[in-house]
Each structure stands twice: as structure tokens, then as C-alpha cells.
Amino acid sequence: MVATDLKNNKNIAILGSGNLGVSIARGIVASGHYKSNQIVLTRRTLEKIQHLKDEEGFQITSDNLEAANKCAILIIGVLPAQVPQLLESIKHLVTKDHIIISVVLGITISGIRSHLQPDVYTPIVRAMPNTAIQYCESMTCIANKSDHPTKSGTAEQELADQNALEVTEKIFNCCGECITISEEAMVSAPALCSCGTAFFCRIIRAAASAGCEIGFHAEDAVRIAAQTAKGAAIMLLKNDSHPESEIDRITTPSGATIAGLNTMEHNGLSSAIIKGIVMSAEKSSKSQAALNKLNNVSS
């Protein structure tokens, strides 16, 4: 297969369309910046994504080569252990006009580059969204540079990297909020922005359970708790304020709010959340170290 001219091609291929890959595709379409027929989804078992073609208009294929040849932006969404095989299979078609965006946990930029053609410089960006991207509400961390680069690229490579970062920011800012961090920080990022979705769901579930105990029906309690959490988050983001500032505005002397907050703190609320996030970050770090060892890639 001969590589296609991709200079004016902005189509997106999601190589490995599992839950996160499909959520990304739907979020990009929901943002209004892409149509579904501009996105190619790949999966070995086509039956699992056939409905996305029939009902939502996405292109689908089981052939990663076909997808890479059609699209300039390649989002890598396979399992970490599958990354080397995937990249080796498409590397002869990957050109300097491609942009590779990896949403794979633990695989470094240098690890990805080691499986591409050494004489072709393709810009690579790592991204860590969460599944709320489907509703354009993701918090996505992205990185394409290390705090401690081993060497500087050429001016042309630096320009390609900057363009790739801007393209990635545009895609993910359309699907929520996006922040650029160093690659080193990507080790811990999932604990806050990806695992964090589950943590906040658990907190909302606990609030809803309390709502049931004080007299609300379960469905109403979940709705009240979720919307209240959403409102609190929006206040912080809109006001660009510290959480304690908003708490101070809500609490009153000897009031119900401070009584509830103090009871929660006496029972370890903040400590439990901090310990949980730190534990997730440590687990993420160990997983990356194991992957680096497996692939013989230095982080």
C-alpha cells in the first residue's frame, strides 16, 4: 500500500475503538467540529462497532493500515501491550504529515517513536482524557515534551511538534477542558483526571445514599446529588476560586453546613480522598515502570 498525500487531510483515525476510543469519537462529533464520516474507527472484531457505522455514520474497518492511509491524525487507543505490534504494522505508512496522539496509559513518547521509522520524524502527543469526553465534559491532560529532554530537535521538528500540540489542544478543548503538562506528570495524571471520574461518582453515590436515608427516593437523590456536584464544580471554574472560598460563602456560624462538614472531616473525608488519589498515582507509576521494562524503553 502506498502512502496517501495527507498535507490537507484532517481526518481522524482511532486505532483501537474500545470504550474510551468510542467516547472520544462521539465527543469530537458532539463538539460540532467534525462529522462522523470524517472519523475512522478500527477494531479487530467489526461486529462490536458495526452499530456505530449503521446508526451514527462513522467509518469502520478492522485494517489499521487502511485507517492510517486515510487519516492524518492517528489516535492510538489499543491496550498498552498491543502498542508495539500496532506501530510496527503501520510504520511504513506513517509520514511526517501524520500526527500521532496516544491515549494509552504508560507508553512514553520515546517508546512510541522506537517503533516508527527512524528516518521519518512524526510528531507525537500523549493525551489522557476521561470518558466524560463523550458529553464534551472531559478533563484532558496532554504532553509532548519532557522536563528533561535528552536532545533538542531541529527547527523543522520543533515546528511540527508545536503544530501537533495545537491540533491536539483544539480537538480536546472542543470536548471539555484541556491542560498541557510535562510528560513526567503524565504518570500521575490518570489518578486525578481519569480515575477521578470514578472517585467523584463514588462520592455522589454516597451523597445519594444519605439522601435516601433522610427521605428521598433513590432516583431523586442521585439527581439532586449529581446536579449539586455539577453546580459546585461550575462555581469553582467560573469564579476561578479556591474551594475553601466557596465553602466560606456557604457556611454560617452554628449552621447545618459546618456541622456536616466537621462530621465528615472527623470521619476522615479529606484524608481518604487524598490517600486514594495518591494510591492510584503510585499504581500508575508502577504500571508504567513495568511496561517500560517489558518494552525495554526508558522513561
Curated annotation (Swiss-Prot):
<dbReference type="GO" id="GO:0005739">
    <property type="term" value="C:mitochondrion"/>
</dbReference>
<dbReference type="InterPro" id="IPR000304">
    <property type="entry name" value="Pyrroline-COOH_reductase"/>
</dbReference>
<dbReference type="Pfam" id="PF14748">
    <property type="entry name" value="P5CR_dimer"/>
</dbReference>
<dbReference type="Pfam" id="PF03807">
    <property type="entry name" value="F420_oxidored"/>
</dbReference>
<comment type="pathway">
    <text>Amino-acid biosynthesis; L-proline biosynthesis; L-proline from L-glutamate 5-semialdehyde: step 1/1.</text>
</comment>
<keyword id="KW-0028">Amino-acid biosynthesis</keyword>
<dbReference type="InterPro" id="IPR029036">
    <property type="entry name" value="P5CR_dimer"/>
</dbReference>
<dbReference type="GO" id="GO:0004735">
    <property type="term" value="F:pyrroline-5-carboxylate reductase activity"/>
</dbReference>
<dbReference type="InterPro" id="IPR008927">
    <property type="entry name" value="6-PGluconate_DH-like_C_sf"/>
</dbReference>
<dbReference type="InterPro" id="IPR036291">
    <property type="entry name" value="NAD(P)-bd_dom_sf"/>
</dbReference>
<keyword id="KW-0560">Oxidoreductase</keyword>
<keyword id="KW-0641">Proline biosynthesis</keyword>
<comment type="subunit">
    <text>Homodecamer; composed of 5 homodimers.</text>
</comment>
<dbReference type="GO" id="GO:0055129">
    <property type="term" value="P:L-proline biosynthetic process"/>
</dbReference>
<dbReference type="GO" id="GO:0006561">
    <property type="term" value="P:proline biosynthetic process"/>
</dbReference>
<keyword id="KW-0521">NADP</keyword>
<protein>
    <recommendedName>
        <fullName>Pyrroline-5-carboxylate reductase 2</fullName>
        <ecNumber>1.5.1.2</ecNumber>
    </recommendedName>
</protein>
<dbReference type="InterPro" id="IPR028939">
    <property type="entry name" value="P5C_Rdtase_cat_N"/>
</dbReference>
<comment type="similarity">
    <text>Belongs to the pyrroline-5-carboxylate reductase family.</text>
</comment>
